[in-house]
Amino acid sequence: MRIAWSPRAVATAARFMKDQEGMREIGAAINALAQDPYPPESFSWGSYRRLRVGPYRVMYAVEAGLITIDRVDRVTAS
């Protein structure tokens, strides 16, 4: 499957560029989606999927051979 980043995803991920290790983990998790777009640690969120990667959440959609990364956010502790 192909992976595409929306402009919003690029903008939201850019806020966390100082966390190089976190960005490497996010990159590895997103690349793994090409092999398995529905890993057991991802959850349905309406028409999106959400994937927790350390302190981050990746929101993405899967459609017709394309995975679109919609946003990357830091998860707040509750």
PLM segments and residue spans:
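Basic, amphipathic "hinge/linker" alpha-helix immediately C-terminal to the N-terminal HTH DNA-binding motif
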Residues: 5-9
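Enriched for short, Lys/Arg-rich terminal
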Residues: 2-3, 14-15, 20-23, 53-57, ...
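A short, surface-exposed loop/turn module that caps and links secondary-structure elements
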Residues: 27-52
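Short hydrophobic/aromatic-rich motifs at helix boundaries and adjacent loops
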Residues: 1-3, 29-30
